[in-house]
Amino acid sequence: MPGQGLARGHSRTLIYFPIAHTLADMGALKESVARATLEKVGRAGLARKTAAIDQIWTEIEAAIDALPLSFDRVRLYQDGLPVCGREAEIVIELAQTGSRNHQLLLRLMAQGAVLMGTEEGDLLVQEYQLARQSLTTRAPRAAGVAATRRALSQALLQRRDQFIAQRINETLKSGETGILFLGMLHALERHLHPDVKVIYPLHRSR
């Protein structure tokens, strides 16, 4: 039967899309990120990067359209979306700024998929503060300072992965399919329960 869904029996399926963030996804950091990218790669480099990310989203959209999904049994998990009760409002706001990621979420929600708060708010605040510090201060000259900053960033990423995986473990029900949009640096697979079958429609760049 068409649209039967990917999760059958007592299994749970997670469709995992490693994503690249656009400037529209950056919120208050948008201008700082654009400025830092311009300084690093120039206007031509920024244009190439923007086009490459745009192509990634075109491929993600096409991959989802090709999947045999029953959207009334689909849950959406999103990088950077806190468990807060305002999840839909946040997605709408970012979609209106031009985020293809969040525009896609709205389209899937309109088809019946359920949007899930995915991240722990305090961890996202720490991530934002660390990113802002990195973007607004000069690169540390001392190797030790740079190493400490990298270690903090990596530890925070691991804590976020653990929370996201726990959220999926607890909310994705038997017979359901989850769609996860998560930045390419993340690696939460080892934190997922063994009955969650992970599928990568696009190449997992690891």
Language-model regions, residue ranges each:
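Compositional signal for N-terminal targeting/processing segments
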Residues: 1-206
